[in-house]
Amino acid sequence: MKVRASVKRMCRNCKVIRRNGVVRVICSDARHKQRQKGGK
């Protein structure tokens, strides 16, 4: 899980979603998982 100020899609399988006010990227490639720093 990468924690970044700016989350971006790294491939076409990546999906940007919002869970409990936190922006996340989920993907079939585990290396592409990201979470946005800061939260609320």
From Swiss-Prot:
GO cellular component: cytoplasm; ribonucleoprotein complex; ribosome
A GO biological-process term: translation
Domain of life according to the entry: Bacteria
PROSITE patterns per UniProt: RIBOSOMAL_L36
Transmembrane intervals: none
GO terms assigned for molecular function: structural constituent of ribosome
Stored InterPro entries: Ribosomal_bL36 (IPR000473), Ribosomal_bL36_sp (IPR035977)
Key words, A-Z: Ribonucleoprotein, Ribosomal protein
Family according to the record: Belongs to the bacterial ribosomal protein bL36 family.
Protein name stated in the entry: Large ribosomal subunit protein bL36
Chain's gene name: rpmJ
